[in-house]
């Protein structure tokens, strides 16, 4: 058994489970009075604190100093993940949780093409099938919701939300490719991730002040802390670490598992129950994840 590969698969699945809760928590944060700018500015500051605390608990805490080339890579990754998170978070203000997840996870198609162009990765037949099955499954989920979609207070503009979710899929596919290249070339993944969050914290810090003037309850900030650490910092770090063990297109296929996670969590937290046909799409996505976890060299 290839234990490094098992570790990579476990990292992506864990990240998907945590990220799967982000859509539902975004809607909860909206109900507590947070705007898109509030969420995007505070999530990286709070997440940065969590990452630094985690790094200090390691047996050999890494030095946080980085040189120029590593900083430029961290800056580029920060811009990519900010675009991904901004588009996805905003999409959850307008469309359903499942629509946002399903359309954002066109990422394997983009990741496969970009990895082939920039990393020279060959997507062999079994993984080609996995990408096709996963994409069809995500589209099936989207189609099932579209047939039964209704505009609600939590999903007021479904077409706009769907477009933003599709944009996040493109950006996420690109981010996975960049993260894989950084992990393979440098290896200092924890430090690179901390710098991603530090860069975004500095850039977005002026917006944080505006949040303090809002009458948001303590429970709202508690939800924001959970969202920032467990649904932002932790999955991004796990995704970056998976680049040490998996190819970019493999990571993106396995990340499709976020769809069933998000649907189940959405049912529990915000009461969004999917149409029955949705579960056929979920089944296809699970098949794609199984095929994607198989080694193809």
Where on the chain are the PLM-derived regions?
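Transmembrane alpha-helices of multi-pass small-molecule transport proteins
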Residues: 34-83, 110, 170-178, 193-211, ...
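Hydrophobic transmembrane alpha-helices of multi-pass small-molecule transport proteins
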Residues: 51, 114, 123-146, 204, ...
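Loop-to-transmembrane-helix transition segments
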Residues: 7-15, 42, 62-87, 160-168, ...
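Helix-helix packing/entry segments at the starts of transmembrane helices
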Residues: 42, 100-106, 178-200, 232-268
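Glycine-/small-residue-enriched transmembrane alpha-helix faces in small-molecule transporters
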Residues: 1-42, 79, 87, 149-181, ...
């Amino acid at each position: 058994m290839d234990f490094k590969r098992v570790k990579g698969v476990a990292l992506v699945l864990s990240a998907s489970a945590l990220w799967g809760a982000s859509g539902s928590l975004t809607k909860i944060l909206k109900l507590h009075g947070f705007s898109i700018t509030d969420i995007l500015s505070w999530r990286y500051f709070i997440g940065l604190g969590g990452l630094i605390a985690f790094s200090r608990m390691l047996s050999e805490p890494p030095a946080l100093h980085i040189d120029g080339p590593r900083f430029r890579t961290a800056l580029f990754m920060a811009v990519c993940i900010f675009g991904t998170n901004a588009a996805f978070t905003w999409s959850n203000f307008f469309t359903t949780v499942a629509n946002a997840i399903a359309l954002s996870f066109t990422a394997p198609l983009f990741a496969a093409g970009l990895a082939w162009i920039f990393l020279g990765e060959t997507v062999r037949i079994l993984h080609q099938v996995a990408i096709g099955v996963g994409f069809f499954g995500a589209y099936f989920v989207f189609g099932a919701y579209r047939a039964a979609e209704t505009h609600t207070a939590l999903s007021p503009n479904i077409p706009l939300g769907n477009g933003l979710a599709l944009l996040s899929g493109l950006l996420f596919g690109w981010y996975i490719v960049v993260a894989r290249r950084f992990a393979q070339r440098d290896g200092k993944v924890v430090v690179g991730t901390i710098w991603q969050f530090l860069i975004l914290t500095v850039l977005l810090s002026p917006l944080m002040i505006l949040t303090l003037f809002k009458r948001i309850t303590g429970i709202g900030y508690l939800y924001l802390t959970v969202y920032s650490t467990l649904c932002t910092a932790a999955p991004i770090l796990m995704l970056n670490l998976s680049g040490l063990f998996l190819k970019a297109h493999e990571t993106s296929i396995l990340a499709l598992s976020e769809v069933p996670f998000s649907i189940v969590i959405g049912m529990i937290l915000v009461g969004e129950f999917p149409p029955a046909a949705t579960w056929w799409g979920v089944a296809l996505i699970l098949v794609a994840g199984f095929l994607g976890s198989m080694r193809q060299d």
